[in-house]
Each structure stands twice: as structure tokens, then as C-alpha cells.
Amino acid sequence: FVAMILLIHLWRDLHFYLIHRLIHFEPLYKLAHKTHHRNINPGPWSGLAMHPIEHIFYFSCALLYLFFPFHPAFIIVTLVHAGLSPAPGHTGFERIKTDEQTSFDIDSYAHYLHHKYFECNYADGILPLDRWFGTLHDGSEESFNKMRARLSKKNQGEFSAKT
């Protein structure tokens, strides 16, 4: 059961990153994900403000349960988590402070930058997928310049492929 909990988090991280990159593919972006990105300065409700097609992609992580045996309680917990986790990820705050000594990281600043620049910070979890795939933007000028260079190179490739 403990191994399942660890594996499901890794699966959800990888699934979210790949689906998020997929829906940034121009035809899917225009059809569905553009609705979500109307929230340039997102708030908690922005997380689930998605086109129905995007909801299908997002919750397709549950397809795993059709092929592998999981305890029903585990399935319920992970689906509830999938439904509620977009809210804290869209608050725009990096930490929640409960008192003078206690605070916890909610990592939503990276997703705020994703809504601001669109072409970075696709991941949303414990795996450093944005770092591994070169899409991390930490808010620094250096990250901004790397993102611009990556986009410029991508756009040049698209231009030369069209000519």
C-alpha cells in the first residue's frame, strides 16, 4: 500500500506534465487549454476553470485503475486529490504561514509564472520534470532569457520547416 502511494504520486506528476505539454500543442491549446489560460493572474478557482476536453485529459490519469488492481479507498483518495489539488496550485503564493515559526511550501509561484509566460513550468509535483526537460522558470532574469532563447530556437525551426 505504501509503495502504491509513492508510485501514484510519481505517476500523477509524470501524467500531469505530459498532458500539460500536450495541451499546449497549438491545435489543442486553441480548442481547449486557452480557456484555462484566460486566467493570467490565477486564483484558487482558476485551477478547475477548464474546457470539458481539458477535464477529460486531466482526469485520464484514472485510466491506470482500469488496468491495475487498486484498493477502492485508494482510488477515491487519489481522485479527490486530483480534483482538489488545482486550487492551492493557483493561489499565487509560495508559502502559507500558520504562525511565526510554522509555514509550508505550496509551490504555486512556479505555476503563476506559467500563467504569466505560458511556455514554462508545466510540472506540478515532486519530480523536477521542468528542470529535466528544460522548461523551468524560477522567476530570475536568467530563467527568462533561457526561456526566450528556447522559444526563439523553436520558432526558427517552425519557420524553416514552413519555407
Language-model features: locations:
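Alpha-helical transmembrane segments of multi-pass membrane proteins
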Residues: 5-16, 77-86
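Cytosolic/stromal cytosol-facing helical appendages immediately following the last transmembrane segment
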Residues: 25-163
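Transmembrane alpha-helix/helix-exit interface in multi-pass inner-membrane proteins
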Residues: 10-30
